[in-house]
Swiss-Prot record:
<dbReference type="GO" id="GO:0005737">
    <property type="term" value="C:cytoplasm"/>
</dbReference>
<comment type="pathway">
    <text>Amino-acid biosynthesis; L-serine biosynthesis; L-serine from 3-phospho-D-glycerate: step 2/3.</text>
</comment>
<dbReference type="InterPro" id="IPR015422">
    <property type="entry name" value="PyrdxlP-dep_Trfase_small"/>
</dbReference>
<comment type="function">
    <text>Catalyzes the reversible conversion of 3-phosphohydroxypyruvate to phosphoserine and of 3-hydroxy-2-oxo-4-phosphonooxybutanoate to phosphohydroxythreonine.</text>
</comment>
<comment type="subunit">
    <text>Homodimer.</text>
</comment>
<comment type="similarity">
    <text>Belongs to the class-V pyridoxal-phosphate-dependent aminotransferase family. SerC subfamily.</text>
</comment>
<feature type="binding site">
    <location>
        <begin position="76"/>
        <end position="77"/>
    </location>
    <ligand>
        <name>pyridoxal 5'-phosphate</name>
    </ligand>
</feature>
<keyword id="KW-0028">Amino-acid biosynthesis</keyword>
<feature type="binding site">
    <location>
        <position position="172"/>
    </location>
    <ligand>
        <name>pyridoxal 5'-phosphate</name>
    </ligand>
</feature>
<keyword id="KW-0718">Serine biosynthesis</keyword>
<feature type="binding site">
    <location>
        <position position="42"/>
    </location>
    <ligand>
        <name>L-glutamate</name>
    </ligand>
</feature>
<feature type="binding site">
    <location>
        <position position="195"/>
    </location>
    <ligand>
        <name>pyridoxal 5'-phosphate</name>
    </ligand>
</feature>
<keyword id="KW-0963">Cytoplasm</keyword>
<protein>
    <recommendedName>
        <fullName>Phosphoserine aminotransferase</fullName>
        <ecNumber>2.6.1.52</ecNumber>
    </recommendedName>
</protein>
<dbReference type="InterPro" id="IPR015421">
    <property type="entry name" value="PyrdxlP-dep_Trfase_major"/>
</dbReference>
<feature type="binding site">
    <location>
        <position position="102"/>
    </location>
    <ligand>
        <name>pyridoxal 5'-phosphate</name>
    </ligand>
</feature>
<dbReference type="GO" id="GO:0006564">
    <property type="term" value="P:L-serine biosynthetic process"/>
</dbReference>
Amino acid sequence: MTRAFNFSAGPATLPESVLRQAQAEMVEWNGVGASIVEISHRSADFMAVAAAAEADLRSLLSIPDDYAVLFTAGGATTIQALLPLNFAAPGQAADYVITGHWGKTAIKQAATYVDARIAADAQADGFVDIPAAASWTLSPHSAYVHITANETIHGVEFRDTPDVGTLPLFADFSSSIASEPLDISRYGLIYAGAQKNLGPVGISVVIVRRDLLERAGQPRADIFNYASQVARDSMLNTPPTWNWYLLGLTVKWMLEQGGVQEFARRNAEKAALVYGAIDGSGGFYRNLIKPAVRSRMNIPFFLPDERLDALFVSESKAAGLLALKGHKAVGGIRASLYNAMPVAGAQALAAFMHDFQQRHG
């Protein structure tokens, strides 16, 4: 059966070669006589898998030596709840910049444990732009400043790293990590759920400057303590080994493809194809986001009549283009163009959009 182009926002498409390798190794892996999902996480075999995944991720993202890398169970929402526990002292404030749905989720999770303050909020303008960093209201003694690098639902993306002075900048990179070069030294911490650009759902990556791990934070169990997790190489308890293995295969694939420089080129080409179809449609398709902050990863757009949405989704599915229905919070159509989406997928979508407009415009 031919694989379709899957535009799902997450869990998202994975490289076919990675899936084929995982399929081939599922029953018996690496000559050990058992599946990768059956061997101990503390065995020499799996420890080698974990070490290779970290080494490859460090190479892919050019992670400085003074940053620790954690592989954690669960997703980004879990991390959002743990950030104040690990990095904010009791009674200390943390600043949040709200540029879409996931920024709102981040501050909601944090507010249970910290004085979570809104430094800037783009909701009044419909989340179509990102407030300039110079306009943010930052607390001088804030534990950190949190941003969402790319908003998957509203389709806005920070195209430059904001300057927050000496405050640690924390960022959710779940949907844009490894999509282009990133100067990690500008951040105190970045994190990402794997299920968009790094692998399958169920595992996340936290990259944190080591000196921040010395903060006392708030009383918490060892399992929620990032310093303890770093000391135990992300194996304080049994990790999601299958997910970790798949993440490692995906990261290695990205390196073999040419690394983040190559994916930046591909992602720019894919985004230009879809935005070109929107902007060249004479208003039949509409994207509401200011051009300077348009996401390259997630492109929401709207048709002239919402009654056409279901027809667009059904016809596109029949054409081998999957998961184009927009998020329920905003409606419309959404195309997610993560690293594993080939340029051919964006070409096919742009061609379908032109054909659909010719028939229904």
